[in-house]
């Protein structure tokens, strides 16, 4: 079964919609739980999550009283120190499923994503992601989205989500918590080195909000600089300093 791990920090505009999307596009028989790991949100993220938990619990209870099958996976809200790597590792420690599925709060996976993931694992593909589509019609972002169909390391990123068996995740040692940013790519690099990565061709839809905030070309330039900084041996601290100065 799959444990979904969602790191959040001030995601009041997305988290409620994402949780409903997960319910509507998966089967409870395949999902152990949905772990939402909050890194100290100061907006209404936690209140929204708690409301979804309460409403879901009440709906399931009413259905059971009527003899109807309305099973939904449990949502577990946990608090962790801020930092996606720390939050996702914390969630993984509390996961009961044999497959971990790491998902950003502004990324919406395809219908039956759970079945698609399980099918790949059953084929022996122990880690991978979905092909990604930005919610933007800007030509460069459409091209960048199209390129994610290829299993190339340079086209990978956390907004495509990440599934991995818990055994493999633990063998690698989880996400490197030295990386405040770029943590997804560090794990992905290790998976490519082990030849343990597959791209599922169904699309996950992800927000282009960072591009809208900074401008497409400006942000793409900074991401490219970060990529080459890591390629040429920059430390996690150096990468974070650059990110904090130009993107955060």
Which residue ranges define each predicted feature?
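Conserved donor nucleotide-binding strand/loop of the catalytic core
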Residues: 32, 46-56, 73-94
């Amino acid at each position: 079964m799959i444990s979904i791990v969602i790191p959040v920090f001030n995601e009041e505009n997305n988290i409620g919609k994402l949780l409903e999307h997960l319910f509507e596009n998966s089967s409870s028989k395949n999902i152990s739980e949905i772990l939402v790991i909050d890194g100290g949100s100061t907006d209404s993220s936690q209140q929204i999550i708690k409301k979804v938990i309460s409403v879901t619990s009440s709906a399931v209870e009413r259905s059971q009283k009527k003899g109807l099958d309305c099973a939904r996976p449990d949502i577990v809200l946990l608090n962790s120190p801020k930092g996606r790597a720390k939050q996702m590792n914390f969630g993984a420690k509390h996961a009961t499923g044999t497959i971990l599925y790491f998902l950003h709060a502004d990324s919406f996976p395809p219908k039956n994503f759970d079945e698609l993931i399980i099918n790949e694992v059953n084929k022996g593909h122990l880690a991978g992601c979905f092909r990604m589509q930005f919610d933007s019609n800007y030509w460069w972002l459409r091209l960048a989205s199209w390129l994610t169909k290829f299993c190339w390391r340079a086209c990978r990123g956390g907004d495509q989500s990440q599934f991995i068996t818990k055994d493999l995740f633990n063998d690698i040692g989880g996400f490197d918590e030295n990386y405040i940013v770029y943590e997804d790519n560090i794990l992905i690099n290790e998976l490519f080195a082990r030849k343990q990565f597959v791209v599922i061709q169904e699309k996950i839809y992800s927000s282009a909000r960072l591009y809208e905030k900074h401008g497409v070309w400006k942000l793409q330039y900074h991401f490219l600089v970060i990529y080459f900084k890591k390629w040429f041996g920059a430390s996690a601290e150096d990468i974070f300093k650059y990110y904090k100065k130009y993107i955060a």
